[in-house]
Amino acid sequence: MDSYAPTQALNEAKTNADPDRFWAVGFPLLAVLIFLMSTHQGIGILPDSARYMNMAATPWDAPVYAAMLQLVALTGIDIVAGAWGIGLVLSGLNAFLTWHILRVASGRATYAAMGTALVVIAPQTVALYGLAMSEPPFLTAILATLLAFLRYVQSGDRRWLIAVGVGIGVASLVRFTGPALGAAMALFLIIDPRHDAKRRVADVARILIPSAVIFLGWAAIAAEVSGRSTGRPLEWLGNMTAREWWLSFNALAAWIVSDELPAVMRRILFLMAMSASLFILVRHGRSVLGRAANGNAEASLIAIPLGFFFFTYLGFMVLATAIETNLHLNGRYAYPIYCTSIMAVTIAMAQVNIADPVIRWLHRALIGLACLMLVSHGIRSTVRVHQAWQEGVGFASLDWARSPTLAAVDRLPRDAVIYSNGSDAIGYVLRRPARDIPAPFMLRTGRDDPNFPYRVQLAGAQAALARGNTYVVFLNRIDWRFYMASEQELIRLLRLVPVAKLEDGTIYKGSIKEERQQ
């Protein structure tokens, strides 16, 4: 019997390794397949995408994704093709990292597979990975930071905390919400029972110093070189009302099931799921911290900073909405904590002791909810992928490619000056520069631009129109830029006359009388 034991152990290890390999390869392949189908008409382009690609009049803010695109473009590769390539790589990489972290931290392949599936096939994931946006690289930075933190928890090697700090600094330059991850990590280090108070403070410093040097160093250099860094004044300019907060809550409730279900049902399911998840996370946290105090450090400790991240991120977003005008906590901004919350609950559920009847009942309820979410996610994501396959997304959609107004703009002289409410659409579809039409106030502040006041914008546009070979283009599909002057207002103030009126827009120029007077 003793001679057989090593062989039996090897066979069991091989049996356990086989499903691990399957999921480690299967999830990245699934993510890549979804990406390829979603970008059948080209990677989706939204207004922020055009900013990252320098195809819009408004510059980008956080620099990392824009730098990635520009570095690819320097090789001679088309920048849009570069964005597609980056998206392809990150879709597979992030799926693998999610699986790997969950597998190591949970210790159970079935739970890790369930958690990874809830991330990979989520409609938010499908939508955002099919776009040239900063969310995929932001999640890569988060996952890489979590992986470094996991190595620290397992080994106790404090050099990994330096890597964590670097990861947080980089994440903060991908999206400015990155510091919330650092706050979550710091909270865990402060309560880590394995070390005394002096060591805990020193460990917090190990992640704080490199992350602060990276972020603040960039901000100082950017302000010196370009005169701007985060692109936001540090003032209390937020204007979210109770209605906007309610809409933000509804965006979070859509994590669970489709918007097509009654709103009351979605809200109740979300609150029940959050309450049950928090209960299990707290129970798991108390248990695993107790074992850590006795010198038994487990990988599942990482569920604690993941749980903290939900609150630090929401706190950061509340602060951001208080500072910036017209900023709402929509599905895009909430996406990172969807992923990390799923990971936290997955790890806790895999490790929590279900001997307690209450925990056992909640555990079963959450498993049932996860199955419901998988079905809902699968249906919604299939619909999204099918629509993206047929029509494309954003400015890369067939509607924009077939726009009669853009076709007419493309026939204008190549040296013509163009003002438009859709300078980004013109920049992407036609690959020619365009300026924004005058705006009475700025989107982020609700105030007139102190560096380029509305009256100066109007005077500049009027002078350009008077010189001739200047056109103002209004695209009817762009109806969300309420901070820009209306079409009727500019017709009156700039004395515009129509050159071409088409089904999806109008092209204007200055009046001949005005030009002759100049």
Predicted regions located by residue number:
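Signature aromatic-anchored transmembrane alpha helix within multi-pass, membrane-resident enzymes
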Residues: 28, 110, 208-212, 299, ...
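Membrane-embedded, lumen/periplasm-facing catalytic core of multi-pass transferases
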Residues: 49-56, 149, 366-427, 450-466, ...
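Transmembrane-helix motifs of polytopic, lipid-linked glycan transferases
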Residues: 85-106, 140, 144-148
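Extracytoplasmic catalytic/substrate-binding loops of multi-pass membrane glycan-assembly enzymes
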Residues: 40-52, 58-71, 77-81, 225-230, ...
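Membrane-interface transmembrane helices that cradle and orient dolichyl/undecaprenyl
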Residues: 14, 104-106, 145-161
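Membrane-lumen/periplasm interface segments of specific transmembrane helices
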Residues: 34, 41, 202-283, 306-317, ...
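Perimembrane helix-loop-helix junctions
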Residues: 4-6, 151-155, 181-212, 285-292
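Short acidic/glycine- and proline-prone juxtamembrane loop motifs at membrane-interface regions
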Residues: 130-137
